[in-house]
Swiss-Prot record:
It is an enzyme of class 2 (transferase). Pfam families: GidB (PF02527). PANTHER family: S-ADENOSYL-L-METHIONINE-DEPENDENT METHYLTRANSFERASES SUPERFAMILY PROTEIN. The gene is rsmG. The keyword RNA-binding does not apply. One of its GO terms (molecular function) is rRNA (guanine-N7-)-methyltransferase activity. InterPro entries: rRNA_ssu_MeTfrase_G (IPR003682), SAM-dependent_MTases_sf (IPR029063). SUPFAM superfamilies: S-adenosyl-L-methionine-dependent methyltransferases. Its EC number is 2.1.1.170. This is Ribosomal RNA small subunit methyltransferase G. Keywords: Cytoplasm, Methyltransferase, rRNA processing, S-adenosyl-L-methionine, Transferase. The keyword Signal does not apply. It is found in: Cytoplasm. HAMAP family: 16SrRNA_methyltr_G (MF_00074).
Length: 216
């Protein structure tokens, strides 16, 4: 999968299209399909994702999450902040399963969403650790910290500060208003950032963040 290759806005993948684009194995597709089923079932009793997005799962959720791995191909330790729906964390764990030393920390403050993550992790035998905690209260040593639909950049950087200060690089999935969010965030934070176009939606962006510190 090429990091800068984006789909057309109207493109919708199925499992075969996702597999061809990402290079996923048959076993990974089986796990991702099972995750789609669990996500749909649990979404009926708790608000995990927009219900209409289940139909576009392979693009909106699977590809949106999977596109992060080529941006950090050597990373084995990941933290997903606000991981309640398992996106991107569960998808990353499925694709990293079997890699030596791989672990994805799923950080979620809502206990009922942690229960969902526990069911998924057990069902799919994933290399994850689930933390029922506030992201900013943990001190985890990871290579990459990520989040999707978690908070505006100013607040998100506050959540991610302990990880970024401990050597992690941030890879955050954001929407088309990210440049406004970044401008606002620079009033409170100093950091290096790089934007990439999302492969799953050319209107979306992936924000890479390094060297974070508070504005003095």
């Amino acid at each position: 999968m090429q990091p800068d290759l984006a789909l057309a806005p109207e493109a919708v993948l199925d499992a075969a299209g996702f597999q061809a684009l990402v290079g996923a194995t048959d076993a990974q597709i089986e796990d991702l399909t099972r995750f789609q089923t669990l996500l749909a079932e649990w979404n009926e009793v708790m608000n995990l994702v927009g219900p209409l997005t289940i139909a576009t799962y392979w693009t909106r959720h699977a590809l949106d999450s999977a596109q992060l791995i080529p941006l950090a191909p050597e990373a084995t330790a990941w933290a997903d902040l606000g991981a309640g729906a398992g996106l991107p964390g569960v998808v990353l764990a499925i694709l990293l399963k079997g890699r030596a030393g791989a672990k994805v920390h799923l950080v979620e403050s809502m206990i009922k969403r942690c229960r969902f993550l526990e069911v998924v992790a057990k069902d799919l035998d994933l290399p994850v650790q689930i933390h029922n905690a506030r992201a900013e209260d943990l001190k985890l040593k990871v290579d990459i910290v990520t989040a999707r639909a978690c908070a505006p950049m100013t607040k998100l950087l506050g959540f991610a500060e302990p990880y970024l200060r401990n050597g992690a690089v941030g890879l955050f999935l954001k929407g088309q208003d990210v440049e406004t969010e970044l401008s606002e965030a620079r009033k409170a934070w100093t950091f290096e950032s790089e934007l990439r176009t999302s492969q799953s939606d050319p209107r979306g962006r992936i924000v890479q963040v390094k060297r974070l510190s508070r504005v003095r």
